[in-house]
A protein has these predicted regions:
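Metal-dependent C-N hydrolase catalytic cores
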Residues: 47-126, 298-307, 311-314, 320
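A residue-level signal for conserved active-site and pocket-lining positions in enzyme catalytic cores
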Residues: 64, 190, 258
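Short, surface-exposed amphipathic charged segments that create phosphate/polyanion-binding patches used
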Residues: 78-86, 173-177, 215
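Conformational coupling and interaction surfaces
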Residues: 2-3, 22-23, 30, 181-185, ...
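Acidic/polar N-terminal loop/beta-strand segments that form early-domain functional surfaces
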Residues: 36-39, 67-69, 279
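Histidine-centered active-site/metal-ligand motif
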Residues: 16, 88-90, 141, 253
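Active-site histidine-anchored catalytic micro-motif
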Residues: 2-52, 60, 95-206, 212
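Short, glycine/acidic-enriched capping/hinge loops at junctions between secondary-structure elements
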Residues: 18-20, 46, 75-77, 172, ...
């Protein structure tokens, strides 16, 4: 079996950290780089969180690239709303105390350009069909890369995005999911580009839930990584207990996206062509594009069912492996 190259595009909140850990624990892929975006935190915080968690998990050599610091149409850098800090903590990783990495993200000393987009295009040209790209935040970096070099981006073997909601309500408005709503223009550009991708949205991520009982062993491991991740996720579960107690734990949004990138058989998907509403009360909603309903070539696979027991078993096994 050929090991695929993996790039994660993260807005480094708590579930992003779990997705990163899942990727590191997965022998099917080689994590070659991380690109960062605004979202759960400002992009600079996202990058430094990535570096700190990589160091914590024994992978400090993985490069981290600074990406988009704002939505495509914004004139000022993005600042997360106060509600986001309640979910992910002020530092984005549940307030957990994780030692800072001695390294800096690529692009930290540059005032021009977007290091993440530069890297993504170079990686697409280098690895082509052997590259897997997973975006777990706003799609700003992907949209910019498609605009700059569509041919390179079309050559990537697999693209998976965590975001959207097709058959269930949104989580920031009646119709919109947070990642898509953070930069609707970017999401719409990606979904209309023709680039084939799999959308892992709220339709399935709210069906894979982690409980306090599930993470009890992380603290019991006695490792720094286990204790840090337990602290992060305890905060995250607490936010769900306040805002969505009916779930019984926290949704594993981003880890599921990484898992599906590795093993697409975890989900059942509907092929369709998507767009994003850009105006009015439904701004940020992902929906089938009425103008392309009869187009036989479907650019998106939307995950609508998930083998939750199998995924949760894999998640617990891999997290135990990486957290000690």
């Amino acid at each position: 079996m050929t090991t695929k190259k993996l790039i994660l595009d993260l807005d480094m909140g708590v579930d992003d950290a779990m997705a990163l850990a899942y990727a590191i624990a997965s022998p099917e892929v080689e994590l070659v780089g991380i690109t960062t975006c605004f979202g759960n935190v400002r992009v600079e915080q996202s990058a430094h969180n990535c570096l700190a968690v990589l160091d914590l998990l024994g992978r400090p050599e993985v490069p981290v690239y600074l990406g988009a610091d704002r939505p495509l149409q914004a004139t000022e850098p993005y600042t997360p709303p106060a509600s986001t800090a309640l979910i992910h903590g002020k530092n984005g990783i549940g307030g957990a105390s994780v030692p800072a990495s001695p390294y800096e993200p690529v692009g930290a000393t540059s005032v021009d350009g977007n290091a993440a987009v530069d890297y993504l295009i170079d990686a697409a040209r280098t690895y082509g069909p052997d590259l897997v790209y997973v975006a777990t935040g706003p799609l700003s970096n992907l949209a910019l890369a498609l605009e700059r070099d569509a041919a390179a981006m079309m050559s990537i073997g697999r693209v998976v995005v965590m975001g959207g909601a097709l058959t269930v309500p949104g989580n920031v408005s009646a119709g919109a999911e947070a990642n898509m709503a953070s930069d609707p223009e970017a999401a719409d550009a990606v979904l209309r580009s023709g680039r084939k991708l799999t959308m892992v949205g709220l339709d399935v991520t709210h069906r894979v839930v982690l409980t306090r009982r599930d993470i009890a062993g992380w603290t019991g491991s006695g490792t720094m990584a286990g204790c840090a991740f337990a602290s992060m996720v305890e905060h995250y579960i607490g936010s769900y207990e306040m805002n969505a107690p009916y779930l019984g734990g926290c949704a594993l949004h981003d880890p599921l996206a990484v898992a599906v990138a590795i093993d697409p058989t975890l989900v059942g998907a509907l092929g369709c062509n998507l767009r994003v509403d850009l105006l009015g009360e439904y701004r940020g909603r992902t929906i089938c594009d009425e103008r392309r309903l009869s187009d036989p070539d479907k650019s998106a696979l939307v995950a609508l069912t998930v083998d939750a027991p199998r995924f949760l078993s894999e998640f617990k096994t891999r997290m135990a492996r990486v957290l000690g």
